[in-house]
Amino acid sequence: MAETTQAVQAKPKRGMSKSLRDSLVAYSSIAPNFIGFCIFTLVPMIFAIGLSFCNWDGVHPVEFTGVSNFVALLSDKTFKAAFVNTLVYAIGTVPLTLVCSLGLAMLLNQKVKFRNFFRTVSFFPYVASLVAVAAVWNMIFSPSMGPVNQILATLGVENLPKWAAGKDTAMLTVILFSVWKNMGYYMVIYLAGLQGTNPELEEAAELDGASKWQIFWNVTLPQLKPTTFFVIIMLTIASFKVYDQMYMITQGGPGNATMTLVYYIYNVAFVNTPKYGYASAVSMVLFVLVLFVTIIQFKGSSSND
């Protein structure tokens, strides 16, 4: 009896499903950013949280000290000055930059001659090198040879301000510099927001006899609420972590008049004897401060919707 052999045919391999393929493409696209976030943000943040409960100078072994770093902050006069200065800088910078950038955007959104030229000029300080613009700013506001004080002297002002060199005027100088440098960037954001407003609502309000101020306050500004919220969040975070302006103009002085939290963290961690644990404790205070203010802003925005 002849044996019959049965050919075994291999089942064809099924190709990768479309959903799986799309998922792999998506994950491969976000993987570089996610890995970079973990390496350069998440891991250092976790390390800083742990280090805030320790003493470490970068050479000797890490010594766990509990909450002693945070207790020491309560009696640290320089930390208190930096904390207050950071709040003062934020309170001065955020509303001024907001108003100036919005006003500039409203002005340059009109059909005026050389509009594109003025937009470019307004944006230039933001993209220019901070070192260059800070040097020009220090020259303009020089107490002895600056053109600003020379104009004030011509007008008969006797006690000329020392600007960045004066303890009472140094913070004001840095605030004015920051507003001037950054308002061009937020002007562009507001210009983009103005392009999304409904002109028909403004025309209807104008036909109803509303003044320009009433149209702006009751029609245009409410439509810019998402843009304004974004600008406030960005300005607040930037003002709390300010460092470069202080370093280039005042170096945190005179005295501690312009010492901010980030500048203090830098001094504690990298100047003289490094105290990485103490600097990490200060950074945790800054993190909580930014988080607290941001949550309040989100709550306020949600309640007004």
What are these regions (language model features)?
Residues 22-305:
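A structural signal for multi-pass alpha-helical bundles of membrane permease subunits
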